[in-house]
């Protein structure tokens, strides 16, 4: 077991990253202002220059360490008469400074890892559309898929202790713990509630960093299990989790298959397991039997419960066959279907007809969720019937048309990788009629009269498809090349997906 400590132990060079002095540097708060704060609002609220503002922040941090929270008690109002300053504003200042400070060592590690791996151009790898070519290449050869929702929320104390294993700076994390318990409603960031706290809205960068770190820690352990699974046994695997000594807290894993398989407690080799994640949702896919998928399911559940002390619901993790079920990921419904192809071959005077069944990944636009989103944005009703957008009726005709066209371009750009474009045409048709009704409402006219007066050419851009542009560019090319550009196209310039 000593050989595996090499893979688990922490790089000792990271222990010398002291962050506490950075919190009291002017340029850290300047970076924070550039990222998340409005300097004019700061000047308006503070009435001081930058040095005086930083001095007040230092005094606030000093006051946080005192037992009598005279200034920043949660029971007090947002504005304390002793100081006369907004508590939420200063919590935002400190959180932005903490976020910038803590991100520095992780950014340096990321840059060094890219240099060691000799990855010079990683820009395209950041695109979320780069996931789908991976699906097209791997998933037709896989059999089972499982949707895994990463459980939350993790306890603050567990999160801070885990963070301390990476950066050995006790002062910073004493301040971090005190600040989180004093100001933050950590659950409000990642708990699906209608009401989001003021802190979550004004400090998304800081809390998103904490959540992403939790996911990164979970994935580092999961990938270790994935890469070393063929060499470890559950009966003697006391080296997993404590990120300093790694020799404790593993007896819970013995209970995974202890009841059904008391004599078979080995990790099974699974070279075909694939893992993909975006934000809090991940996909596990494998070529092997459902038993191995079930094994990984219970490993993850025990990992969350025993190491992170996060409750996970096993009943919500379903294992499905790719050929029979679709999985929802990044706004697409994807499944693997059989694509029959008939090949006729002739040998001398005899001809043969051979039928081959090829597996192909289908990516389908989820029409019903999109219509619900359009209905929520007041472009149509719940049945998909277009309605006018009265909020935009005060804008100019050019601005109204440009807004609708921009939405259509974004949807077409993102969903151009769909196998079936009819759903996209329907969405664009809804937006087209909604635009016409909005213009008619503005001019106090009917849709028919408005179109008759201006002509249907006014909105013909709604149906200008990107593949038509490609066909114009490659008009002299071969028919095979034209057919290629009429198919699915994945763009590597899309870095975010808004629900």
UniProtKB/Swiss-Prot annotation:
Secretion signal: which residues? none
Recorded GO CC terms: chloroplast
Short name of any one Pfam family annotated for the protein: MatK_N
A biological process from GO: tRNA processing
**Which superkingdom heads the taxonomic lineage of this protein's source?**
Eukaryota
A GO molecular-function annotation: RNA binding
Which compartments does it reside in? Plastid, Chloroplast
- Keyword check for Plastid, yes or no: yes
Q: What is its main location?
A: plastid
**Keywords assigned:** Chloroplast, mRNA processing, Plastid, RNA-binding, tRNA processing
Q: What does this protein do?
A: Usually encoded in the trnK tRNA gene intron. Probably assists in splicing its own and other chloroplast group II introns.
Query: Family, per the entry?
Result: Belongs to the intron maturase 2 family. MatK subfamily.
What is the protein's name according to its record?
Maturase K
Please tell me the species this chain comes from.
Answer: Albizia julibrissin
Which gene name belongs to this protein?
A: matK
